[in-house]
Design a protein with these regions (language model features):
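General beta-strand structural signal in soluble alpha/beta enzymes
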Residues: 105, 131-134, 155-158, 189, ...
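N-terminal ligand-binding/catalytic initiation module
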Residues: 1-155, 375, 381, 385, ...
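Rossmann-like adenosine-cofactor binding region
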Residues: 232-301, 307-309
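Solvent-exposed alpha-helices and their adjacent loops that cap or buttress functional pockets
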Residues: 12, 55-60, 96-97, 122-124, ...
Length: 390
């Protein structure tokens, strides 16, 4: 199937993948008076007395904003906010289909960090959470941090944290397959953008001790010249042995390679230098750092990619609907590391021992157990940490 042509036909035909649904009858004068004036004044007055009542008297409790500036849309790059709308609508469809979360796309005509932060912060009272989407690094870090400081609802950059959660879930199960412990492995990450940074932080929280990040200039280590503030911060908590050199040097002896970088970056020769039963997560899209067959031929035991046409797809849709479902259910103020760890472990646990194998380390996106498993784990973690409001 030619997905490009068929998708374009679909979008011309439906003219938008979302619409508003009405949840109350408006088929009589009495019904109209309850849904709108004069009756609607009473819930307004209740919310005026206590703004938290907006969660009980409006759809705020179940509504998320999907926010972009169009600067890093898929592999298309900076295409602008209007051009990003089909992706944002698609994201909203996934929220509803896989998490029963109502989501609204907000495409902002500005690349200025403060413009975006101010716009979203001023609208935050209408939503139970905000999903930041396809915003270029390093601005995405600053936007998320500033927004979370100003808002008392979850601000979640899915390109960072959703990727990290699914990566960790896959790694938990891949390590079971090869019989290794997370605290014993050497792990190399290629790519120090939004996803790479978030994956690094979550894997460190999960127990990885020997983790080396690589960017275009090679291994990141303390004292390396030209590091931006984010990379300098990561240099202080990664690469404990201070390894230097390019990817081809530092990958020697590694148990795990995680790629969130560029096509073809990992060669068969590099895989051959890795430890026995190596794990490869090659997630550059649409072309991975190395093709699965090539990685396996070079000795890799478990290979995952971001593509649906290969086994072991690392796909954010496995986690973000459930994470928001859980956060919204308990009115969490933010999404913490413990909530993300809980989501990853819940996702990994859905693949039982009998099904677990080299080509089956993650559940399928259409597995109906995912929403409840992930959301309940996230809600429980939020309550345990004191982040929940109900």
């Amino acid at each position: 199937m030619n997905y490009a042509e068929k998708s374009l036909e679909l979008h011309y035909e439906v003219k938008g993948k979302l619409e508003t649904a009405v949840r109350v009858p408006v088929d009589s004068r009495e019904a109209l008076s309850l849904a709108y004036t004069p009756g609607v004044a009473q819930p307004c007055l209740e919310i005026q007395k206590d703004t938290d009542k907006s969660y009980e008297l409006t759809r705020r409790w179940n509504t998320v904003a999907v926010v972009t500036d169009g600067t890093a849309v898929l592999g298309l790059g900076d295409i602008g906010p209007e051009a990003g709308m089909p992706v944002m609508e698609g994201k909203c469809v996934l929220f509803k289909a896989f998490g029963d979360v109502d989501a609204i796309p907000l495409c902002i005509r500005s690349k200025n960090v403060d413009d975006i932060v101010n716009t979203v912060a001023l609208l935050a009272g209408s939503f139970g959470g905000v999903n930041l989407e396809d915003i270029s690094a390093p601005r995405c870090f600053e936007i998320e941090e500033k927004l979370q400081a100003r808002c008392d609802i979850p601000i979640f950059h899915d390109d960072q944290h959703g990727t990290a959660v699914v990566m960790l879930a896959g790694l938990i199960n891949a390590l079971k397959v090869v019989g290794k412990r997370i605290e014993d492995i050497k792990l190399v990450i290629s790519g120090a953008g939004a996803a790479g940074v978030a994956v690094t932080k979550l894997l460190l929280s999960a127990g990885v001790k020997n983790l080396i990040m690589c960017d275009r200039k090679g291994a990141i280590y303390e004292g390396r010249e030209g590091l931006n503030p984010v990379k300098a911060q990561l240099a202080a908590i990664t690469n404990p042995k201070g390894e230097k050199g390019g990817l081809s040097q530092v990958i020697a002896g590694a148990d795990v390679f995680i790629g969130v970088s560029a096509p073809g970056l990992l060669t068969a020769g590099m895989v051959e230098t890795m430890a026995k039963d190596a794990i490869i997560f090659a997630c550059a899209n649409p072309t991975p750092e190395i093709m699965p067959d090539e990685a396996k031929a070079a000795g890799a035991a478990v290979v995952a990619t971001g593509r649906s046409d290969f086994p072991n797809q690392i796909n954010n849709v496995l986690c973000f609907p459930g994470i928001f479902r859980g956060a919204l259910d308990v009115r969490a103020r933010y999404i913490s590391h413990s909530m993300k760890l809980a989501a990853a472990h819940a996702l990994a646990a859905l693949v039982d021992e009998a099904e677990l194998g080299r080509e089956n380390i993650l559940p399928q996106a259409f597995d109906k157990r995912i929403k409840d498993a992930v959301s309940q784990a996230v809600a429980r973690a939020a309550r345990d940490e004191g982040i929940a409001r109900v």
